[in-house]
Amino acid sequence: MPSQVLKRVFDEAAQLSGIPVIFRASDSLQTQANLKMARNGELAHIIQYHTKYAMQKEYLGTFQAGFILRAFGANQSNRFEVGSTPSGRDEGQKLVSEHFQRLGVNLPDNKLRHFASAIYDGLGVQIRSVPVGLRIDSWILTNYPELKEQQ
């Protein structure tokens, strides 16, 4: 049963987006929590938190729901997704390859592709998540001071 804070935030996210929020524990996540925002007719936004962080689940759920609120709170004409393209991925691999060549490092193609992909995807996640995440944390601190100890 979600806390009053989670219920309020999830209800607001569902009302704003027109899509319900499912919140559940998982012991297989690689992170503390994640969000799979509903797209292309999916029936729910899914927020998961790792069972190791159950003591912080109110904060983790509120933080992830903040991404839904920010995405759907923007005018539809101003919404966009940060994502990768095949040409961007190819350019990233080329840049990483050139850098290794300058260093005199010779990686097999499969390792180079794997490394370049990790760098490319990691940078994309950071560019997309960190600025918004900082704003969400500030919003939580201002609007839900009872979660401060979990932040």
Predicted features and spans:
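Short linear interaction motifs
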Residues: 41-48, 114-122
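Solvent-exposed aromatic/hydrophobic patches embedded in short alpha-helical segments
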Residues: 123-136
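Pan-zinc metallopeptidase signature
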Residues: 135-151
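Hydrophobic, Leu/Ile/Phe/Ala-enriched alpha-helical segments that form helix-helix packing faces
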Residues: 6-17, 65, 69, 140, ...
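Auxiliary, metal-adjacent structural segments of Zn-dependent hydrolase domains
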Residues: 1-41, 54
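Active-site recognition of the HExxH zinc-binding catalytic motif
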Residues: 57-76
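Post-HEXXH active-site segment of zinc metalloproteases
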Residues: 70-119
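Short pre-active-site segment immediately N-terminal to the catalytic Zn-binding motif
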Residues: 45-61
